[in-house]
Amino acid sequence: MNILLAASEVAPFAKTGGLADVAGALPQELHRLGHDVRIIMPLYRSVRKQHLSLQHLGELPAVKMGDAIRTGRLWQGSLQDVPVYFLEQDDYFDRDGLYGTSQNDYPDNAERFGFFGRGLLAALPQIGFKPEILHLNDWQTGLVPALLRTEWAEDPFYAGTATMTTIHNLGYQGLFPAETVATLGLDPALYTMEGLEYYDQVSFLKSGLVYADMITTVSETYCAEIQTPQMGHGFDGILHARAARLFGVLNGIDDKLWNPQCDPALTAPYSVDDLEGKAANKRQLQKQLGLSCDADVPLLTMVTRLASQKGLDLVEQAWEQLLQRGVQLVILGSGDQDFMDRFAQLGAQHPTQTAVRLGFDDRLARLIYAGSDMFLMPSHYEPCGLGQLIALRYGSVPVVRKTGGLADTVFDPQDQATQANGFTFREISPSAMLAALDRALALYRQPEGWKQLVRRGMQGDFSWRQSALRYVELYRKAVELHHA
């Protein structure tokens, strides 16, 4: 199949979250399955700084944005054997952040990603690549299905092209003032309750949900959760109405990129058959972060975005009780400034028992996965989650709230003794989190039982292959629905 994946961030070029990992890994697996898959993303300042070897493909056709005409340029690079197109438009994308500063989103994000949607549709005929499916991701590409139904409706180039919108996180909805319709020069007929209108605002994500041929999200449990009022972020009605076209496909991880046997960031390699190197990584992590070097102390870690979704309120409320249990606690992450400030203060109070590192550091993240005994994800909601999959691969036992993709990948001995690979809790409370941790700590004190759990986690197959095969199945179904 001819597949174009459009995303606002793609690892390793630009990343703020899990979307980038998916957008970088899935196309490579689709390519290995024999499909002609290509990627398109904006050319951000951070991408320029990498001095990639890019080929200039020419000027973009003029893109009309309301009363203004915007121009841009098109570049081509590659990710392994997958072509990657970069849309250059310096007024929109030559900035320090992808979406904003640590305090605020950029005020012109509607224009920026409106341009990205229009620009990618203008670019493909110029490139001469006619996709059977446009795989769109999150609100940043949400306008594309609406544009295809209006501005491009009569264009023969896209006559047979189906669309799929993947929801990586329903909490990010691309909400903008109603006047955005005029600012971007969108067809006013789109601004209805059945279209882009959402409580007197415009929602880019809603456009993707309403107008795409198919919707997917990143785990089966999250797919069910978002059709409920409690978890639907106001879109449960739309999603329930489109349930016949809504599917959950679990994300994978790139098992070549995440492999403790050959990860260059680790002090010592190790494997499911030889766990000895894991202890050396724990020792190095303790030393590097200024923690007491003790092989026996349970080392509990988090690599996370510092946002309310991630259950950091539970960690903050349980901080002293966590430390009273004798664990060492390591947190690496960046995000909301108030969380960063509060956790920096907490981390400084017990420097030999806790370490909080703000920002993102890939080498340190890898050492954390390898050196930790337990990996904590107490998320209020978690569409899929990649952290628990990497933790399992690296033999770090996940302690997670049973929601979304966490419920689909982490199995508690109380529920599934033969498949157990971690510990789960359901209630959103510090006491429920601590109870799950206490069960983990009890098993940690039984070395043979603990090793068995660690090994079972490391043996799990969370590679992209099965997910990619499922996506191909759904791409074909989307094309059928488009032609029906």
From Swiss-Prot:
Alphabetized Pfam families for the sequence: Glyco_transf_5, Glycos_transf_1
Record's keyword terms, sorted: Glycogen biosynthesis, Glycosyltransferase, Transferase
Cellular component terms per the entry's GO annotation: cytosol
Catalytic activity: [(1->4)-alpha-D-glucosyl](n) + ADP-alpha-D-glucose = [(1->4)-alpha-D-glucosyl](n+1) + ADP + H(+)
Top-rank taxon: Bacteria
Enzyme class, spelled out: transferase
Gene Ontology molecular function: any one: alpha-1,4-glucan glucosyltransferase (UDP-glucose donor) activity
Pathway(s) this gene product operates in, as recorded in its UniProt entry: Glycan biosynthesis; glycogen biosynthesis
CDD domains: GT5_Glycogen_synthase_DULL1-like
SUPFAM superfamilies per UniProt: UDP-Glycosyltransferase/glycogen phosphorylase
Family per similarity comment: Belongs to the glycosyltransferase 1 family. Bacterial/plant glycogen synthase subfamily.
Protein name: Glycogen synthase
